[in-house]
Amino acid sequence: EDCPALEPSVAAIPFDEQDAHSKRLMAACDHTAFDITDDNIRRSRRAYFANISYIDDKIGDIIDVLERTLQVDNTIILFLSDHGDMLGDRGLWFKMSFFEGSARVPLMMAGPNIKPGSYTDPVSTLDVTPTLAELAGISLDDVMPWTDGISLVPGFSGTRRSEPVLMEYAAEGSNAPLVCIRDGRWKYVHCELDPEQLFDLETDPDELRNLAPDPAYARQIDAFRKQRDARWDMAAFDSAVRESQ
């Protein structure tokens, strides 16, 4: 009961003080229909952590089978999630945003020729396929030349990643596509309908201070806008999403 992890790391933010996309998410979840108590939050987080423990046990079962069948030295084990969960942080739940609780996920790998260690540069789930292909000796140029992402294998020996991580969102709670660029300590978020967001995750890991309106960060904003425009045609992106529905 005294576990600090049962409490949100960021207290609920009043609806009127939320950013535009978070307001849409709260409206999409019909936030006024529920009176979420502190006990509800703790129970929800406890259940989430219980799920993690359950998955951990099942991964142990898989590794046990690999060891008993003498396949562990010929197997690459990868643990990954496609998204996180806000779990009440900022008063938000589920996924659907670029905040760290939603977008940041674990990525762990073990197998032949993978030395134990850690890698702190931002990477993407898009990097998984190129990484596994290189570890398996497969050239994606021969079989899947259209594949996005970059191999993380150089990172196993300490090579730093220089490419930014790109993210897109155009699902529940969005009235237009959102895009995000994570480049080192910086996170930039853009939607044609909303004010821009810029966070310095080194000094503000909870993403509580949007630096985009601050003239002191005009250089960073200009650089991110150029990256954004080089990568996305936002009008075409919006049209493609609507036509696909």
Name the predicted role of every residue range.
Residues L66-E67, G155-F156, A212:
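Hydrophobic residues in alpha-helical segments
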Residues H83-D89, A110, K115, L126-T129, ...:
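C-terminal cap/loop subdomain of S1 sulfatases and analogous C-terminal strand-loop tails that border
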Residues R45, R90, K95, R104, ...:
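Basic side chains
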Residues E1-P122, L135-M144, E207, P215, ...:
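Active-site-proximal cap/lid insertion segments
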Residues C29-N40, V128, L211-Q245:
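Long, internal low-complexity/basic segments
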Residues Y54, K58, D127, T131, ...:
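Charged catalytic carboxylate motif
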